[in-house]
């Protein structure tokens, strides 16, 4: 493991890339009682258009990344991995964003056993047609819940107006139509394409011994490195829809203002760019700003 010290926060991070392509980062904190682990896959709701090896572009239903996140908790014997984590005294969860899917656990005991479950979660998939149909009903109910949330509707509608006719114009969970189009074949294809170590990263933080983790990976049988790159299609941007409105049952009107950037940001600059935007918007529209007070009072 390569060591890197961050003097500003007085933390030492250990980082390596395994022979199978998985990136591993460790942040030991002896003063913690728990260990927190997360594995992140570079696969989110916007990844619905991919370029095949032969150059053809293949399209998948919106919401497939989120659907796959749900299904991976199901084991071959129809039991679920959430219960397996619970039996070890751990909490487990997962979430899908526009660009990533993350699976996580927190535990005070059985650290390596929980790490094994996390590995199982992202390296094996067991789908059946019947279980997919059941999951469609569950996710449709989740989608309807978001549709009843004014803040969620406001956010996603604003995003859709900024990026019309792109994957960003659809909710992360998908639409009623796209959820019903998700099937066994396209779930298997996306699992094979995106869920490979070279497209994943593991982060562990908490009360653990670095040498013990290193020994765990040295003894573990790793898959062969798959270096085939996932080629994503770039968005074709349309004109911004400048104004829009909707009616919902709320106690007072809500307002959202969206600004679409006009340039690409390098990967290495994304984090800094994000912080700068948050600071800018907090000054312009934060609840302590003059602009916020004027909008609120009007």
Regions found by a protein language model. Give the residues of each.
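His/Glu-rich zincin catalytic helix
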Residues: 1-80, 188-292
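Charge-rich, well-structured scaffold segments of protease-associated domains
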Residues: 17, 28, 80-229, 261, ...
